[in-house]
């Protein structure tokens, strides 16, 4: 319910979009992290260009803020084509999708964010477009209605989602390339923070960039947001370079701890530890205990905590690990 208000939320914020676009890499050679994805996409793109074909349809999934839109833009740039952007909830009617598809040039990219939220009627129109580059359109109404087929130019559909499991099998099976984005390591994030600091004209030391990177929850979008807040702190509270000390003071003031946890993460972990004796606890009980929706816990709070080894999923529910106890200076009673 309050995810949008969190400083370390990985969700996009409209007022940040302009700055984020300016800091995004444009080509694969500028793309940092995700080495397996980068290597595979380089081969797929080169092969498609060598054949003179459109790139196969691409599904990109993973937690928010890891660069799905950035990768889609890079693909379009590397292929030398235009990209049209929309999102699942926006495409309410079949005609909305048809209008986009009929305006594509050969090999263009159509990027659909939140593709798991497509309506069934729109999805049905998408199937023949993806498979046969054809569009089935109904003309007229009632008994006089008839279907006509329109040929489409070869194009690449790039779908992005945080919930790949919510895609229907027929849609998922039509993607020739599927890429999962993982959380970034600290070294890659530090490089990204340094590059963003250059774009913003900041004097950021190695220690300063490291402090921002290690608290950014493995997520470039969060790293860039924290960097901007550290910049604000530095402009008011200090002079000169943003050092490790300045970054630490700023992030401590913002209540983002050394693991990148904010009060919601700490609330979740302490609920498991204090209210449920470390677990296991069912998701519904945990959601009620902290006043959040189960989807928020599952999609927003848990992934990073599980990846970092602070929560363990078991058949009987969630458990706090020894890492979680140590983070709060506690000892688990056996």
From Swiss-Prot:
Homohexamer. Forms an RuvA(8)-RuvB(12)-Holliday junction (HJ) complex. HJ DNA is sandwiched between 2 RuvA tetramers; dsDNA enters through RuvA and exits via RuvB. An RuvB hexamer assembles on each DNA strand where it exits the tetramer. Each RuvB hexamer is contacted by two RuvA subunits (via domain III) on 2 adjacent RuvB subunits; this complex drives branch migration. In the full resolvosome a probable DNA-RuvA(4)-RuvB(12)-RuvC(2) complex forms which resolves the HJ. It is found in: Cytoplasm. ATP binds at residues 24, 65, 68-70, 131-133, 174, 184, 221. The RuvA-RuvB-RuvC complex processes Holliday junction (HJ) DNA during genetic recombination and DNA repair, while the RuvA-RuvB complex plays an important role in the rescue of blocked DNA replication forks via replication fork reversal (RFR). RuvA specifically binds to HJ cruciform DNA, conferring on it an open structure. The RuvB hexamer acts as an ATP-dependent pump, pulling dsDNA into and through the RuvAB complex. RuvB forms 2 homohexamers on either side of HJ DNA bound by 1 or 2 RuvA tetramers; 4 subunits per hexamer contact DNA at a time. Gene3D superfamilies: 1.10.8.60, P-loop containing nucleotide triphosphate hydrolases (3.40.50.300), Winged helix-like DNA-binding domain superfamily/Winged helix DNA-binding domain (1.10.10.10). It holds the Pfam family RuvB_C. This is Holliday junction branch migration complex subunit RuvB. Keywords: ATP-binding, Cytoplasm, DNA damage, DNA recombination, DNA repair, DNA-binding, Hydrolase, Nucleotide-binding. One of its GO terms (cellular component) is cytoplasm.
């Amino acid at each position: 319910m309050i995810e949008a208000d969190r400083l370390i939320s990985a969700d996009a914020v409209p007022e940040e979009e302009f700055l984020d676009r300016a800091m995004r890499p444009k080509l694969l050679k500028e793309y940092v992290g995700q080495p397996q994805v980068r290597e595979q996409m380089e081969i797929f793109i080169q092969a498609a260009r060598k054949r003179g074909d459109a790139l196969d349809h691409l599904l990109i999934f993973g937690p928010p803020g890891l660069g799905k839109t950035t990768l889609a833009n890079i693909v379009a740039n590397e292929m030398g084509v235009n990209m049209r952007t929309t999102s699942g909830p926006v495409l309410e009617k079949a005609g909305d999708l048809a209008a986009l598809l009929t305006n594509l040039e050969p090999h263009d990219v159509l990027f659909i964010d939140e593709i798991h939220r497509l309506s069934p009627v729109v999805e049905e129109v998408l199937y023949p477009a993806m498979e046969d580059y054809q569009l089935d359109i109904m003309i007229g109404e009632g008994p006089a209605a008839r279907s006509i087929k329109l040929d489409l130019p070869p194009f690449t559909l790039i779908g992005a989602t945080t919930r790949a499991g919510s895609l229907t099998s027929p849609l998922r099976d039509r993607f020739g390339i599927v890429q999962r984005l993982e959380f970034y390591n600290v070294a890659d994030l530090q490089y990204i923070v340094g590059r963003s600091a250059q774009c913003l004209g900041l004097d950021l030391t190695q220690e300063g960039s490291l402090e921002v990177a290690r608290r950014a929850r493995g997520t470039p979008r969060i790293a860039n947001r924290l960097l901007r807040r550290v910049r604000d702190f530095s402009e008011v509270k200090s002079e000169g370079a943003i050092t490790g000390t300045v970054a630490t003071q700023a992030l401590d003031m913002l209540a983002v701890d050394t693991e990148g946890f904010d009060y919601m993460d700490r609330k979740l972990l302490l609920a498991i530890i204090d209210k449920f004796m470390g677990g296991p606890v069912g998701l519904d009980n945990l959601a009620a205990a902290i006043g959040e929706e189960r989807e928020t816990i599952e999609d927003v709070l848990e992934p990073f905590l599980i990846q970092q080894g602070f929560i363990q999923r078991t058949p009987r529910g969630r458990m706090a690990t020894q890492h979680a106890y140590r983070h709060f200076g506690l000892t688990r009673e056996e």
